Amino acid sequence: MKVSMLQSVFSCVLTIGTAVALTPPVPIPPPDKLEENVFAALADSSQSETGIAYFEQYIDHDNPDFGTFSQTYWYNATFWKGPGSPVILFTPGEIAATGYTGYLTDATITGLIAKEVGGAVVLVEHRYWGNSTPYEEQSTKALQFLNLDQSVADFVHFARTAKLPFDKNGSSNAESAPWIWSGGSYSGALGAWVESLAPGTFWATHSSSGPVQAVYNYWEYFYPIQQGMPANCSEDFSAVIDHVDGIFLHGSEEEQADIKQMFGLQDVPHGDDAAAAISAPIWAWQSIQLYSGYSTFYQMCDAIEGFAPNATALKYGDGAVGLEKALPNYAKWYTTNYLPGLCESYGYDDWQGEDNILCLDTYNASSPMFMDWTESNAFARTWAWMTCNDPFFYWQTGAPEDRPTVFSRLANAEYWQRQCELFFPQEGEYTYGSKRGKTAEMLNEHTQGWHLEDTKRLFWVNGEFDPWRSASMASEFRPEGPIESTPEAPAILIPGARHCNDLRVTNADANEDVKNTQDAVVKQIAEWTDEFYSSGKGRRGLPRRS
């Protein structure tokens, strides 16, 4: 697939923290950050086609007089054909948007759509992330205005009223021009929820890997991983986890101390914390892209099976080596390649030292994990708020007893829910939603969750082995089964793909199924865009006004 000259001069920053250990991975799309010199050229204020701008957004849409905050957005109107032409909106969701400036270009599906339909790309930062937060301190009280309904209202208000610098006469606001939502992961689900809660605001929606169903006990997160990872590695990893759980549940104090020592976790007081920490490297699966090559996940599997790195003599199809070999093999890799410097990497004074493992104690209320209330905290505090408050939950847990598990069953839903109180202690009358009795069932009834079949011009894309597939419309656990493709709601399940693999052109360059999916999405969005103009709703490419 050919891309513009702009693509060739930026670097793609893709590492989503391989050292995941303290909290479950958040549902975010893969980062794609422009090099500084390229971004500086895009943000040059002397020209109007590209740049950075700010939108005064209501803090509380139910009470506009309460005040506003500055919501940051970036724009690229290089492909825009003038007032009345389409606008493609992308938000990375629950992360600062500065790492996603590549989504302004045709190195990503947003830019491909813009090029095809003659539209502009607008990258909007989500409330409470990056520079787009109304409060510097993320206290329980300050976070009261971070919820799904306020977030949906943000994008509706922006689409309808933003004075885009490249659109001098306002002819490209929603209703006057077709706005197209393209999002991945939470932002993919958010696009579907906007269509559910504010239908018609966006003319068309592309939702990639969107977990639309809130789930309290989300053991199903690991099911696609088990289906996609090498079978021998899955069998052996599961055997290790069962063994570790058995010791912490039924073993003597000496046996529990020995297994902690084996994994370098002798200073972790609680067995469930130690078991969760031993399980944590399985999370590396989510960040794999189709061009990732020899990723951390496969290095771990090689180590468990006793393969030398990049070995060719033995294949993943060979049988499992069994617990007797897998346990010491995994412990050696864990203590050599995974654990050293893990806590230190977060940058807090209390966690300095390569062998420091204090970060793994989730019972310590004074831990920086719970006490850092700044926007720049390292623990996705604001996302943790949404999981506890809306509540999305998505607590990633061990499988039921009648199924193999690759994550400790000691880290159950209550293990994660317990941490909500440590993250967000009550301040006067202010607390989080699930403490007030809100449930996943309530949220799903509000958004329609898995029952989003009756939508217009919404394109669903999922990866076969994406762990967030289990909460998506393509879920095998959906009572009606994975959604079937229709003309109004096309659906593609990409064979062998993981999380949001259709968003970046480099994945299409590496995989024909992804390329075909990107082509299908772009073609369908273009057809829907033509329908907007043919229906008389607006005029494309009105003369530009200076």
Per-segment meaning from a language model:
Residues 186-200, 205, 212:
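Short glycine-enriched nucleophile-adjacent loop
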Residues 201-326:
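A catalytic-pocket lid/entrance helix-loop region that shapes and gates access to the active site
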Residues 168-185, 190:
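Alpha/beta-hydrolase fold nucleophile elbow
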Residues 282-543:
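C-terminal subdomain of alpha/beta-hydrolase-fold enzymes, centered on the catalytic histidine
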Residues 128-141, 216, 502-503:
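Glycine-rich "HGGG/HGxG" loop immediately N-terminal to the catalytic nucleophile
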Residues 142-170:
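Alpha/beta-hydrolase active-site loop
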Residues 10-120, 131, 138, 145, ...:
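Catalytic-loop region of hydrolases
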